[in-house]
Structure formats: structure tokens, C-alpha cells
Swiss-Prot record:
Binding positions (substrate): D309, M374
This protein's name: Aromatase
Gene behind this protein: CYP19A1
Subcellular location: Endoplasmic reticulum membrane; Microsome membrane
Pfam family, one: p450
Amino acid sequence: MILEMLNPMHYNLTSMVPEVMPVATLPILLLTGFLFFVWNHEETSSIPGPGYCMGIGPLISHLRFLWMGLGSACNYYNKMYGEFVRVWISGEETLVISKSSSTFHIMKHDHYSSRFGSTFGLQYMGMHENGVIFNNNPAVWKALRPFFVKALSGPSLARMVTVCVESVNNHLDRLDEVTNALGHVNVLTLMRRTMLDASNTLFLRIPLDEKNIVLKIQGYFDAWQALLIKPNIFFKISWLSRKHQKSIKELRDAVGILAEEKRHRIFTAEKLEDHVDFATDLILAEKRGELTKENVNQCILEMMIAAPDTLSVTVFFMLCLIAQHPKVEEALMKEIQTVLGERDLKNDDMQKLKVMENFINESMRYQPVVDIVMRKALEDDVIDGYPVKKGTNIILNIGRMHKLEFFPKPNEFTLENFEKNVPYRYFQPFGFGPRSCAGKFIAMVMMKVMLVSLLRRFHVKTLQGNCLENMQKTNDLALHPDESRSLPAMIFTPRNSEKCLEH
């Protein structure tokens, strides 16, 4: 009886299903369509790159940069998607470009003169709207840059040869300080101390503890790389950044003490002209109310870290290449003997060292240290047919660019790549345009002087089984040897014992 009563209900429900199903399915279909649209709405972008995927794409993109390092991640994306790629860092659209025409356009124009990075990270470093390296305030940057341009050209450029020769020879005379029991020379420590000494002699002229300051510079640079693109949440958890904050504070405090000593010497000097240099110009501008104390200290810090930070590694890579290529060493030594003979190096010799200059250029092309440049678009633009919105982050992968276009043997180390003049749009180790490296001319002089001075006294050799290509490196803000895995050491053999003793 009961079963019979239920049968009609069963039949009625069954008959209702076809009518109810379309109504219930419609919202599901709409939701599915919406999600599909969101998932793919960025796929229509004209710029190649990973998909947006409901925000998963930007998250993975940023994580990849944090995990691999800036330089390595740029190489990954350019290799995967081409030479003009759209990715994300901190949720912001970022272009990774290794195309010479695009790079030329960006470096040339003033509306790409700003950089990008974590505001919190740059504040920790003292670089937020201060100094010149990562200052993102165009007005403040333009006010500070002339101090660097003046210091890195003119009289300082002329004095660099004498200062650098003296510094190199003084440190080579004390080579035992950076040589272990096996006779292996820690080349990076040697270069860092030498370059810090030369920079101090030219720009600050205050006695300092080279060993101590060099270690602090290394800690500062490690913190800079670690904090530059960290997400904001990282800075909310104090213990995560405590180590880096300590490293930053140590160098900033040390530079602050040196700057105070410089102020004291300036304001108690009988003859001010005896103290005129980069730091003096900054301090006098501070006294006139044109700069703040923070501006002065940060500019001194950035001037003091520039050479030990990048040029030291650059020269180390060059020495490795010389050791690996005997014919190149022979050509360099022949030119040194032809130009100098037995006399000391002079400023007039710089232009005559053509083989040395080609070697330096090829070394920077083949094994760069600074292989990426970070910029931000300050207005809407179109680059090589691609629309670029105001506020877009840009990373120029110049290290990859130098191995893609123009050079006859891009993947080999050979001086043939610079036998003919190279148009500067294809080779930009120091950049050009409004935000080019202010020290590019003095850097070339320093490298020539250091290499000539060292090679005249020593034959260099890598440790057995070591070569530049198989060396463990980290490629983040800059490309450095991984010092945590192996000592950046070489063997120095005197070329002429009597000549060495003369120094």
C-alpha cells in the first residue's frame, strides 16, 4: 500500500529532472566560463611570457626570481620565451629584454632613468631616494649624480694611474697576507683591498682598516642582493631580516665614523685646498644646506663599495682567462713590453694599450659581472612594437644580449670578437645615456693599471682542474664566484725575481 503511494511521487520526481537540470546547470556554466576567462584573460597579451592563471603566474614568477636569483631567472625566461618577455616581480609587470634594439631605446631615453626594487629593502640599505645606485627619486638622483661625475673624471681620472700603480705594488709586496700555506693567493681579497685603498686615496683620504671594511662591504652586498626584491611580508617578520640588517648597519656605521673624521679635518684645516676631493665637495654642499648628512654618508658609502664590489670580481675573472689562454697572455706581455719597456706606467700609455683594451672588453662580454640592468618606465611607450605602460619594471639582460648579436664568435672567448670596431648599441658593459655608469672611464683605467702592474711581476695560474667555465657561481644582482663552495684562489709565480725586489 505504502509502496503504491510512493510510486506516483517517484514518477513525478523523475519527470521533473529534465526541467530542473538546465536551471541548475546555468550558474555552474556561467561560473566555469568566468573562471576560464580569468584564467586566460592575460594570454591574449602581445608580449610573450608565462600566463596569468588566476594570479598563480605572477606568484610563480616572483618565486622563481627569489629562488634562482635575478640573473639566472632572466636567462631562464629569455631562453624559454624569447628576447622580449613579460613576467612579474612583487605582482608588478616586469619586462625581461635581451634585444639590442630595445636595450638601446631604453638606455637612450630619460623616461627610463629610474630603477625598481623593494621600498623596504632599499630603506634598509639607505638607498631609498638617496645615493645614485638605486635612487628612484629622479630629482634627488639628478642633484647627487654631478658629484660622482666630477669625482670620476678630470683630475681624478688623471691621478688614477699613479694612485693605482702604487696601491697594486704595495699590496703585491704584502702578498703573503692573502696567501695560504699551500701558496694559493686569495685573488678576490687581494683585489678588494687594493681597490678599496685606491678609492680611499682618491675620494676620501681617511685612514681605515682595509681588512675590516672589505668584510663589511661583502656583508652589505650580500644583504643588498637578498633584500632587493623580497616581498613586503618578509620585512614584517623581523627575525628573517635580522642578519642582513646587522650587516648593513655595520658598514653604514663604519662609513659614518669615517665621514665624521673627514668633516673634522675639513673644518679644522688651515688650507682647505689640501683636502679637496669627492667627500669634501659633498660635505661643503651639506654645510651650504644643499645636501643632508644622510645624502653625504650614503654617497661616500656607494663610492667606496663600487670598485671592491664589482671591479674586483671582474679582474679576478680576467686573470682566470689569462691563465687559461697562454696565447692571449703572450700578446698582452708583448704589448706591455713594447709600450712600456722597463719604465713605469704613465697616464699617456692608456690609449696605447690596444690589445689590453680588447682583452678587457672581450672578458666583460664573455664573462660579465654586472649582466643585468634594472629600470622602470616613467611614461607610456612603445618598444619594438610592444606597448609598455607607465610603471612597468624592466630588466635588461645585457649579458645574454652580448652573446646573441653582432660578434663573429659569440660563445667563444677570443680577441677576434673585437678586432673590428663594435657599434656601442651591441656592447654595453657600463650602459650609456642619462643613467649610464658614472665611473666607466675610471673603471677602464683601473683595470688596465691593475692588469699591467700585476702581469709585469707575476705569471698567473689557476689551481689544477679549475677554470672559469666550471667555477661555481651565483647569478643574482651580479654574477660572482660562489665563495662558500671554493676559495677564489690562484698561483702567482714571479716573472723576474730581481724586478720584484725593486718594488
